[in-house]
């Protein structure tokens, strides 16, 4: 019944198996990928008819993680997979980027690739398997897919490169890099790094590139046995058509490209296609040429003009040389109510960035195949239509926005303080207010400025730059800080972010059939110099984090308690913790390890909540003195609430140093009296005395001391800061079972 074909290779100690002919046989291409206990089904479907006139390849990649793959039922009300998660969107883009450039340039048939994770093994990189499976499925389909792509993941642990590290290993790795390519060229790189040098990054790419070559071999073997006939493709346009358009309109196109302003240049260029189509109207009516052929030839001429200026004259359309960076302007503290804000402008690209602090309760909950976890740092990239002067409605975040936001997140994340050093959750929102190339790297720069102004103790300022490439044969030019047109007509978009000491994020996309390591080396070094220049401009405005938080930021304190006391703070059905929050106005978060984080809008609210918590968890010592409240009076004595929710009993003989007839003659419910703990009965209930209690020293152990280190950066505007909100770290301070391990106060 099945004509199954299987190819396998031992890769990094595990067997990678590709098979076709058993599942999804009606799809143009279908491959089952297996490694360890991971199983993916990757399919490719190609429409029979071309979709002419759209000007781009209508390729759609959908990566799906099925909950059953990890033995889970989807959470939420609807128990089925719904809208793609950010993780699924990011992997879909990861698959798309090395594959898209390898189709025939004239191919415009709608193409859908679906990669579904059917069984999940955390010991295997399913995103890498998805790229491999998608490439294999396309190689079997009729699509004119010109090269075969494979990919690998690279980590750096203890100075050694690790191929396809597990999730557990990635937690200790200095590098998380994905590289994809063909048998002779690199097509795509994406990474997060902990301040690695350009040399280390290049070596990591080489290591990954060499590692996936055996995978390309088995994909080729599978395609040789199972592929379908490829669609025959024609040239995009006749060569004679291009020559005729050049003869008539090249001067006008050159004049338009000589305009340095993006808006004016675009306006003039947009007028030309109508003139060209009008000139060829009779040829269009006679079906000698199609509109699409004419527009394609015109775009090719525009590309030639831009590229020749760069390669032959070392001159770009805005007048810069290949290494020049556009003019930079930085401003901080624009938004008075935000916890931190910055405006970063580079040429005609601009990003308005804000920073907001929250509690651990505000952290992003992520439900994945690995299980549920929280993200403390969130970065949202927004690209509104007005940034490029387009009249379009605002929509939900696009795949592009999700991808750009994650790239900026990778650039910033390695330099953030850990939760012990800085207890807040952090949300950064970067809105692109103008765009003419490299808006994601403007987001990185603006985020660094906003975080420092907000007072986040980042390790070092971070800047990002986008590099471009124009390549004709062996002749090439690497461009620093590319414009939108240079991205569109160029051959590469190579984004590099990092500090003055090293790289934190890298992303490379290629539009040609790949680049070699010589070009990558030149691009990395040129990016380093550009990054240092940008950092120099940023440092003129702010070079280190402020020592004080915004007056609008919440106050926070963290204490450590005995884990057995957690239930006492929470109370039955959450009654106690709810009462503390309602009466104090604070927010409280309790971790399983006994870490209690308290957040409030001001110092007084924080103190009320903290005192209530300490009163609950404190273990009183015999001989301590407390201010107690009489809760019930009996003939034999009185019950007194002496600390937190703890009550003790004062026998009638311990009420006074003198003889009394009745307890009620001395004590009434609600009275505040000093009591001394003198012991516990055989049931563990406290025995108290009022006699001579005021002659002994009072207890002060319920309030651990806090060491506060007050510092202030006088260079910042006084009116934007509250001098009482200081960063303060204290050493361990014991108070019996209540032990303050890291108390940080940012008080009003």
UniProtKB/Swiss-Prot annotation:
Q: Which residues form the KH domain?
A: 554-613
Q: Which InterPro entries match?
A: ExoRNase_PH_dom1, ExoRNase_PH_dom2, ExoRNase_PH_dom2_sf, KH_dom, KH_dom_type_1, KH_dom_type_1_sf, NA-bd_OB-fold, PNPase
Chain intervals with Basic and acidic residues compositional bias: 713-722
Spell out the SUPFAM superfamilies in the cross-references. Eukaryotic type KH-domain (KH-domain type I) (SSF54791), Nucleic acid-binding proteins (SSF50249), Polynucleotide phosphorylase/guanosine pentaphosphate synthase (PNPase/GPSI), domain 3 (SSF46915), Ribonuclease PH domain 2-like (SSF55666), Ribosomal protein S5 domain 2-like (SSF54211)
Q: Does the keyword Transmembrane apply?
A: no
Q: Name the keywords, alphabetized.
A: Cytoplasm, Magnesium, Metal-binding, Nucleotidyltransferase, RNA-binding, Transferase
Q: Does the keyword NAD apply?
A: no
Name the chemical reaction catalysed here.
RNA(n+1) + phosphate = RNA(n) + a ribonucleoside 5'-diphosphate
Q: Name one GO cellular component term.
A: cytosol
Q: Where in the cell is it found?
A: Cytoplasm
Stretches for region Disordered:
691-748
Give GO terms: molecular function aspect only: 3'-5'-RNA exonuclease activity; magnesium ion binding; polyribonucleotide nucleotidyltransferase activity; RNA binding
Its EC number is 2.7.7.8
Which leading EC class covers this enzyme? transferase
Q: Where is the S1 motif domain?
A: 623-691
Q: Enumerate the Gene Ontology biological process terms.
A: mRNA catabolic process; RNA processing
Q: Which coenzyme or cofactor does it need?
A: Mg(2+)
Purpose of the protein:
Involved in mRNA degradation. Catalyzes the phosphorolysis of single-stranded polyribonucleotides processively in the 3'- to 5'-direction.
Q: Which family does it belong to?
A: Belongs to the polyribonucleotide nucleotidyltransferase family.
Which protein is depicted?
A: Polyribonucleotide nucleotidyltransferase
Q: What species is given as this protein's source?
A: Rickettsia africae (strain ESF-5)
